[in-house]
């Protein structure tokens, strides 16, 4: 209901609103009917990318370069001026194919989640933010990024269709980074405008929701995320970088698996290794993905290197995070003593309120 209300309250309302219901078993379809929102019904196994493609296919033919697609998740509520601000950022920038908002926590609305996203060479999702960072305007502005989350992304429709939409091998997770990478390789750019704000619950990533998409082997979010991260790197990188990237992926997976075992999380450890194994036994998927991307590539895929964190940056960030969490474990504040997080509380709260085992959890 909050998402539907947020769409209806936009200062610049969308020209058309289409919802896609992928086999929900709650009252979503009834809610959409009551709100008079056109909606499509797909099977529960459909991924986000294919759902968007189905929705776009119902639109009249694209006749203008100024036609845009605004994507929202069912757990992402836009501020009432979000669409207006996103459109303002691209009004005089014809080379921009994608723009996204600042993303804050759903309940803790001072918790800064994203101002653009990237991917590290070991497959880690990279936001450039501290795990418990609060929004004080320190990252505000309009600037280029590798990509933005699909929760709130505004995409030029002509470019979306020219690139073939999202890769349907990425049912969930990392489809945003992959699409942004392909946008850059096609000679276009991606922006963030922090004047636009979205509040996101990240229900799937935080494991509050079962992952039922077809590609989700064993329905494990971490397994799907790691597999998709490796797929994005192997299908988008230049061919001569593939051996090094493969070694980095294997090394990082082994290190994280060992860390999970020390943290007594064997399920997550197995996810790390199974993710790579799933790609190893299906090299045809990587070959097909590389061939598909090559058709629309106008510049070297290394154009996005400037948006990727260096190894030094990653190492320093990991050490700082580890130090902060050890300090929190040894010297807890009064607010951290005896606190229990219920299912209804914000799972996106600062890391200091989470279990120390989150040291090894993938960054969101």
Residue ranges and their predicted role:
Residues 239-363:
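Non-catalytic, C-terminal membrane-associated alpha-helical segments of glycosyltransferases
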Residues 186-285:
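Active-site-adjacent helix/loop segment of glycosyltransferases
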Residues 64-77:
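Short beta-strand-to-loop acidic/aromatic patch adjacent to the donor-nucleotide binding site
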Residues 42-61:
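Glycine-rich, basic loop-to-helix element that forms the pyrophosphate-binding segment
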Residues 146-165, 169-197:
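A short, conserved alpha-helix in the catalytic core of glycosyltransferases
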Residues 79-120:
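Conserved donor NDP-sugar-binding/catalytic core segment of glycosyltransferases
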Residues 13, 21-30, 44:
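A conserved acidic beta->alpha catalytic loop
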Residues 5-14:
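Short, acidic, metal-binding catalytic loop of nucleotide-sugar glycosyltransferases
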């Amino acid at each position: 209901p909050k998402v539907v209300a947020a769409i209806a309250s936009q200062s610049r309302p969308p020209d058309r609103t289409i919802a896609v219901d992928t086999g929900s078993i709650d009252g979503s379809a009834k809610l959409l009917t009551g709100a008079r929102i056109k909606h499509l019904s797909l099977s529960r196994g459909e991924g986000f990318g294919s759902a968007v493609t189905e929705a776009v296919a119902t639109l009249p033919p694209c006749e203008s370069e100024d036609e845009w697609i605004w994507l929202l998740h069912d757990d992402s509520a836009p501020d009432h001026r979000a669409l207006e601000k996103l459109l303002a950022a691209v009004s005089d920038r014809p080379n921009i194919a994608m723009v996204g908002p600042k993303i804050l926590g759903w309940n803790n609305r001072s918790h800064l989640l994203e101002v653009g996203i990237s991917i590290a060479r070991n497959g880690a999702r990279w936001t450039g933010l501290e795990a418990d960072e609060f929004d004080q305007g320190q990252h505000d502005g309009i600037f280029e990024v590798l990509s933005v989350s699909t929760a709130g992304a505004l995409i030029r429709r002509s470019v979306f269709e020219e690139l073939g939409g999202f890769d349907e091998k990425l049912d969930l997770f990392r489809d945003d980074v992959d699409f942004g990478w392909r946008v850059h390789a096609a000679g276009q750019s991606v922006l963030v405008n922090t004047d636009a704000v979205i509040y996101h619950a990240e229900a799937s990533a935080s494991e509050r929701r079962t992952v039922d998409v077809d590609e989700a082997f064993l329905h494990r979010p971490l397994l799907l995320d790691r597999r998709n991260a490796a797929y994005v790197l192997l299908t988008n990188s230049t061919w001569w970088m593939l051996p090094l990237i493969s070694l980095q992926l294997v090394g990082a997976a082994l290190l994280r698996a060992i860390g999970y075992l020390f943290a007594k999380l064997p399920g997550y450890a197995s996810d790390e290794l199974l993710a790579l194994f799933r790609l190893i036994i299906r090299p045809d998927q990587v070959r097909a993905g590389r061939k598909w991307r090559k058709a629309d590539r106008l510049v070297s895929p290394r154009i996005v290197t400037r948006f990727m964190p260096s190894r030094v940056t990653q190492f320093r960030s990991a050490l700082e995070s580890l130090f902060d969490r050890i300090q929190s474990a040894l010297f807890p504040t009064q607010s951290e003593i005896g606190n229990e997080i219920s299912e209804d509380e914000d799972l996106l709260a600062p890391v200091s309120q989470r279990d120390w085992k989150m040291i090894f959890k993938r960054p969101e």
